Design a protein with these regions (language model features):
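Amphipathic alpha-helical scaffolding segments comprising HEAT/armadillo-like alpha-solenoid repeats
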Residues: 1-2, 27-49, 70-82, 105-124, ...
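Structural detector for internal amphipathic alpha-helices that build alpha-solenoid repeat scaffolds
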Residues: 8-35, 56-70, 89-108, 130-148
Length: 169
């Protein structure tokens, strides 16, 4: 509920409080990340609903979810990056940007990243707002900077990044 405020200072503090457990130095386990992600998903559902007219709260929810970096948070971001499921361009923008952050957390395995990146490229080819497309391309570029991969995986994602950007054009 703290994200529903329109007071910038309170909103910043609320977001900071939600992000702190996800900081790399905390070292949250995969199970902890999954449980925290589920709790956030449930708490953010009304904020991300089309009925919520507080887009600032919805955007902050997407920003927090992007740092969870797991499959379920990535699925929420994918849903809000698609014009067929999200009418608000501001949410598509931040969901698209959030996917790049999610990819770069290094939590998702390569085989989980690839189908999400392919969907994002498809969304980019249909997106009517140039500024959303720009964030989608940024997120596709982030595939070239996923941490914790071996040389072969890194090379595959670098190649995929370029292929998907070309395909989206």
């Amino acid at each position: 509920n703290a994200l529903l405020t329109k007071d910038t200072f309170s909103l910043f503090n609320a977001q900071r409080h939600l992000i702190e457990p996800l900081e790399p130095e905390v070292g949250m386990s995969a199970i902890g990340r999954s449980l925290y992600g589920k709790a956030l998903k449930d708490a953010f559902k009304p904020l991300l609903s089309p009925e919520n007219d507080n887009e600032m709260a919805a955007i902050n929810s997407l920003q927090v979810l992007s740092l969870v970096g797991n499959e379920q948070s990535c699925g929420i971001l994918i849903n809000h990056a698609d014009t067929s499921t999200e009418q608000r361009a501001s949410l598509r923008l931040w969901a698209s940007a959030g996917l790049g952050k999610t990819f770069k957390t290094g939590v998702l395995q390569t085989q989980r990243i690839i189908p999400k990146a392919e969907l994002l490229a498809d969304f980019a080819s249909r997106e009517p707002k140039w500024y959303v497309v720009a964030r989608m391309f940024d997120s596709l570029t982030s595939l070239q900077h996923v941490p914790g991969l071996n040389d072969i995986q890194q090379s595959e994602l670098e190649e995929l990044s370029l292929q998907l950007q070309t395909r989206a054009l």
